[in-house]
Regions:
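Outer-membrane beta-barrel transmembrane strands
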Residues: 53, 123-145, 204
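Predominantly the C-terminal beta-signal and adjacent terminal strand-loop region
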Residues: 36-39, 179-239
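Glycine- and aromatic-enriched membrane insertion/assembly motifs of diderm outer-membrane
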Residues: 49, 58-117
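Structural signature of outer-membrane beta-barrel domains
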Residues: 48-50, 89-95, 141, 160-164, ...
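Residues on the lipid-exposed face of transmembrane beta-strands in outer-membrane beta-barrel proteins
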Residues: 68-74, 88-90, 134-140, 155-159, ...
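Extracellular/periplasm-exposed beta-strand and loop segments of Gram-negative cell-envelope proteins
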Residues: 54-61, 96-129, 162-190
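Short loop/turn motifs that connect adjacent beta-strands in outer-membrane beta-barrel proteins
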Residues: 25-39, 75-82, 143-151
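Bacterial Sec-dependent N-terminal signal peptides
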Residues: 1-27, 234, 238-239
Length: 239
């Protein structure tokens, strides 16, 4: 019995000693980076609206836009809540509308308005684009070194270079698909605005130049196609 008491005393003393020693271990404090930057990856989803449409042209379905990339943050003040953002990204945009792009025997693209006067039925007509984009943003936010959750308003300018464009037509005359049509304006640019809290932000893009080159006109009326896009949606910023 005496042996058990001595053993119990030794174990109890050792346990209490360990607990006391563990309690003396200092807990490291949270490191705060006063020179933080909001370098961010971004992902966006938009509904694409066509404006400045030629006579008889209309959108015929949901037109989707997707974008993603990375933006480097360059703070401009000591508080670091005002900054410039420089980035690079990729975008995909589809446009469902009734401008039928058909190439003639000389491989020249013609642009037909598929309105009520068009004599053949069709079930699908759209074009879509792939672009490399360079966004530039002026950034205002309520961020602090301690928090990653804040309100933001980012205004900016975006330049995009189309490296691929594709048109699709499906109807009574058959299925027509063309790649890299010369009539598209390869250089596209516009104004941007994103505003919101934390990850979720509303996004607007307003194009400043038309989708097609200046010499592109409708086939029958010879009307210049000056249409451009407004994109409305959501953009997500991820640290």
């Amino acid at each position: 019995m005496k042996t058990y008491c001595i053993l119990f005393f030794i174990i109890s003393f050792g346990f209490s000693k360990a607990c006391f020693s563990q309690g003396d271990i200092p807990v490291p404090s949270k490191v705060i980076d006063s020179l933080y930057k909001e370098d961010q990856f971004y992902l966006g989803l938009t509904y694409n609206i066509l404006v400045k449409l030629p006579t008889g042209v209309k959108q015929t379905g949901f037109s989707l836009g997707l974008q993603g990339g990375f933006i480097k943050d360059i703070p401009l003040n000591k508080r670091r809540n005002i900054a410039i953002g420089l980035g690079i990204g990729y975008s995909y945009n589809s446009y469902n509308q009734n401008i039928g792009i058909i190439k003639d025997d000389s491989n020249e693209a013609k642009y037909f308005v598929l309105d009520d006067t068009y004599e053949f039925d069709y079930t699908k007509n759209n074009f879509y684009q792939h672009a490399i984009e360079l966004p530039i943003e002026f950034r205002w936010r309520t961020s602090t070194p301690e928090s990653y959750r804040f309100w933001r308003i980012y205004t900016g300018f975006k330049v995009g270079y189309l490296f691929s464009n594709i048109s699709n037509f499906k109807g009574e005359v058959g299925s027509l698909r063309y790649n890299d049509i010369d009539g598209f304006n390869d250089l596209q640019y516009g104004l941007t605005l994103s505003a919101g809290y934390n990850t979720w932000n509303f996004y607007v893009y307003y194009a400043l130049n038309p989708m097609f080159n200046d010499d592109v006109k409708t086939a029958l009326k010879g009307e210049r196609i000056e249409m451009s896009a407004i994109k409305l949606g959501l953009i997500f910023y991820i640290l």
